[in-house]
Amino acid sequence: MAPSIQSLSMIHDSQECIKPIPAFYCCYLLRSCVRHASLYIGSTPDPARRLAQHNGDRNGAAKRTLRENLRPWEMVAIVSGFTSRVAALQFEWAWQNTKVSRHADLDGNVIQELGVRICPRTGKGVKGTAKPRTSLTNILANLHLLLRSPYFSKWPVEVRFFSADVHRVWQVWLQRVDGLLNDGIRVVTDFALDGISEVERKELLAGAGRVGTLDVGYNSIKEYVEKSQFLLEDGERINCGVCKQRLILQHDIIAVCSHSSCHCAAHLSCLSSHFLKDKDSDSELIPREGTCPACYGKLEWLTMMKEISLRLRGQEEVNRLFRRRRQAGTPKGQGLKSVRGRGRGHSEDESDALQVSTGLDIVDLTPCSDDPWTIDCAIGELGGIAHRPGGESSGNDSDATITPEMETPPQRRRRNQNTRTQRLGLQKSATINLSDWDDAEVIE
């Protein structure tokens, strides 16, 4: 059954205080490249930026990572897939304080009683009196323990290892422990810093290594968001793909299939029941994944929830996602007018397409400095489209271009001296008087 109008109005009224599901949030494990026994657990929405802070390249490092004799730090593992900052902080605290966490079964944490460590290089157990809280084996064992707990095992998280020796310790511990992880928790490897020299390793660490390649934005679902907006704003009648009832676009919470070729939409509650019915599980209240009732493609629940939360709560994030990036070197708020044709009656995208199809180069007579347009400035901005009087155009385009009549440097200096007193105390204008181009001639 679709949610009531009253409940939906409460959701829409609270859009200003409720943020959408974050694009990325993770808990991470740091290890000192100088002293491997020094480890640190934290959380962040941007691992590359946070790693740069810990290494002193940016401000904001944690107190425990400020010591220069322990830098640089490397990020050896992350746990991602949290649906909110609060959820990530909750898991971070439980990982740091597993012994006192209510989500951990201490009877199964045998490593704290035996004090067993696993050597990352050999993969063999080492008995000793080392502090169990600071050992890599103990931290990974606590991670495995939390992921097996009834609370965290339901979360759609992913464990990613960036170091082969740390992953080796993880695999050895899996062979020692009795419990297994939930099938919905994925464990992936991303080794890029192994098998290289120490110099190359430090250079990669300075650039965040493989951590810097993680997608921490909404770019992965950009086409999905655009497709949903187009489908729901089209105005046509849309029926639920599960219950076949008409969808009320203004009131119903609607889930759209993430596959580009499928136009299936359904009530969120109907689709959830459909997923859980296919799963045939009475213990789960929220599904992890399912199949589309129309195209039978695989759908991830978290991806669909991100799109819905962006549509209902994240108008700023959506605007930022589809905002056209300003070209490097172009002043803020000013587009690259010199290479953009603007036809009357066409939008910005349509005028760009029109210029490409017709091959027209429309010159914008906008000054690049306080002085009148000079030859060097014209050539630099227009890439050789504007040419010297009496000369030949640098391009092979046969379309007509407008070339202003240039003044000599002495004439320009005299004119500047006459107008300097009039402009004193006033802000310099960045526009050109149209009378300056009364004598402009069209070269055919």
Swiss-Prot record:
Pfam families: GIY-YIG, SLX1_C
GO MF annotation, one: 5'-flap endonuclease activity
Domain spans labelled GIY-YIG: 23-105
Cellular compartments annotated: Nucleus
NAD among keywords: no
Chief location bin: nucleus
GO biological process terms held by the UniProt record: double-strand break repair via homologous recombination
Cofactor list: a divalent metal cation
EC numbers, comma separated: 3.1.-.-
Region annotated Disordered, chain positions: 323-355, 386-444
ZnF SLX1-type span: 240-295
Principal EC category: hydrolase
Disulfide bonds: none
GO cellular component: Slx1-Slx4 complex
Keywords: DNA damage, DNA recombination, DNA repair, Endonuclease, Hydrolase, Metal-binding, Nuclease, Nucleus, Zinc, Zinc-finger
Protein task: Catalytic subunit of the SLX1-SLX4 structure-specific endonuclease that resolves DNA secondary structures generated during DNA repair and recombination. Has endonuclease activity towards branched DNA substrates, introducing single-strand cuts in duplex DNA close to junctions with ss-DNA.
Assembly, per entry: Forms a heterodimer with SLX4.
Family: Belongs to the SLX1 family.
Name assigned to this protein: Structure-specific endonuclease subunit SLX1
Species the sequence originates in: Paracoccidioides brasiliensis (strain Pb18)
